[in-house]
Amino acid sequence: MESGDYDVETKREKLKSVLSQLLADPILADVPRNPTLSDVVTLVSLEKGSAMRLSVVKLDGSSLDVAVMNSATLKDLKLLIKKKVNEMEQANMGHRHISWKHVWSNFCLSCNNEKLLDDNAVLQDVGIRNNSQVTFMPYVMKKGRGRHSKRKKHRLFRSLHKTSS
């Protein structure tokens, strides 16, 4: 090993040591274990007041805290929830597949009992502020003329019943 390689490796180990000490500090408890640049930018923005912290209450009553920029849309929040839940699942149980298409077609987010359905809506425009609580709520997507979609099984049985009469 050349002396230049040794210096780089020594510096890398020293940096890892300093970073682990910093991340162990209780003040930085909200920093993820392996933060991305966007995580750091959001946390800095939170300190400056240009981001907000939200509590997302899941159907089982547990909650998770997320930080989003003040200009974030509902779509941004959904992506952040997906990322956070996937990270938590990975840390707790290894990889477990969650069908987010299924989740968002059967549930929606709500704030103050108001269903949040427009993915392009800016969170602040729909009344979400710093420290707001957002909850999952059962939701059936409507199809066409204002009628709720029906499960295919029921349609099948109904058509069988009509032909036997």
From Swiss-Prot:
One GO process term, biological-process aspect: mRNA splicing, via spliceosome
Signal peptide region: none
InterPro entries hit by this protein: SNRNP25, SNRNP25_ubiquitin, Ubiquitin-like_domsf
Domain Ubiquitin-like, residue spans: 52-137
Superkingdom of this protein's organism: Eukaryota
UniProt xrefs under Gene3D superfamilies: Phosphatidylinositol 3-kinase Catalytic Subunit, Chain A, domain 1
Localisation per UniProt entry: Nucleus
Keywords on record: mRNA processing, mRNA splicing, Nucleus, Ribonucleoprotein, Spliceosome
GO annotation, cellular component aspect: spliceosomal complex
Region (Disordered) location: 145-165
Pfam families linked: Ubiquitin_4
Subunit comment: Component of the U11/U12 snRNPs that are part of the U12-type spliceosome.
UniProt protein name: U11/U12 small nuclear ribonucleoprotein 25 kDa protein
Organism of derivation: Arabidopsis thaliana
Name of the encoding gene: SNRNP25
